[in-house]
Amino acid sequence: MAKRDYYEILGVERSADEREIKKAYKRLAMKFHPDRNPDNPESEEKFKEAKEAYEILSDAQKRAAYDKFGHAGVDPNQAGPGGFGGGADFGDVFGDIFGDIFGGGRRSQRAARGSDLRYNMELTLEEAVRGVSKEIKVPTLVECDECHGSGARTGTSAQTCPTCHGSGQVQMRQGFFAVTQACPHCHGKGKIITDPCRKCHGDGRVQKTKTLSVKIPAGVDTGDRIRLAGEGEAGEFGAPAGDLYVQVHVKEHPIFVRDGNNLYCEIPISFTTAALGGEVAVPTLDGRVMLKIPVETQTGRMFRLRGKGVRSLRSGAEGDLLCKAVVETPVKLSDEQKELLKQLEDSLNGSGVKTHKPKADGFFEGVKRFFDDLTG
């Protein structure tokens, strides 16, 4: 299948300057980015197509080769005039072969992409479970609004480096071998700024604290990262910006412990409710619900409230809330209450029914068997 024309992909004229090309690419990248169009193969393909077109047309040498030879001039799998891929001489060929050994092949030096940034965001459990929008402030480097990222004073432009002719690299030949290194004149940039911008001092970028609104999806957990494409540091001299990664950390909750999509909590139960049964109020993230406690409930028994956990960020399935019963021993008893408990104990012990204390009776019977085995 034949490739589309790069200028047609970006929707610009063949005479478009760097700024117009960059603006067109940004518009398409925002429109078709995979993060904005999940599970949409067509958008992903258009995003890749626009990215490829921008990578060629934003590079002066590659653009010149494309304008002259079309796709064959920039596709390494297609040979250009002379059979060496775009009319390369033997110096180019040997430089590509041996240059990797001595510091990189002879390639066009592109302006560096902006650095990625990380922002640590702390959320409450409720925010993580339900989702939330947060406004954050991020100190970063942004494109200079006076020179529009060129680094040159308004009305002027950067000049092609006379030493490396815009490649950003020079070759030092030692017999058969060619060693490639960064151009010492332009420091690998390929361009010289003779009249730098007064605001950014030739860097093309300035320090600024950006205010961003971040939408946190429901179901995130500690360790999850949210990528904001193009919100990192601005690239050098019009190169693409880096990305911003929001690192999520969920604070400890006073009641609930999260494990995956399930929540866990302990519910205190009076010893009378545990013995006779009843209902207790149980907290959930959606409000309180009443839980029926069966008779003879012991500490450690788990009760599952289905669908009261966390909705999965990926599958949408709802987790459960698991409640562990903790039978409370009454404290600060009056003399009358203590006497009543003693009467109850005497009644239980004198009934001859072992099932009144199943765990205690089982424990002491096990201890007796253990010592009988030792002495027998």
Swiss-Prot record:
Its cofactor is Zn(2+). It is found in: Cytoplasm. A zinc finger (CR-type) spans 131-209. SMART domains: DnaJ. SUPFAM superfamilies: Chaperone J-domain (SSF46565), DnaJ/Hsp40 cysteine-rich domain (SSF57938), HSP40/DnaJ peptide-binding domain (SSF49493). Zn(2+) 2 binds at C161, C164, C183, C186. This is Chaperone protein DnaJ. It comes from Tolumonas auensis (strain DSM 9187 / NBRC 110442 / TA 4).
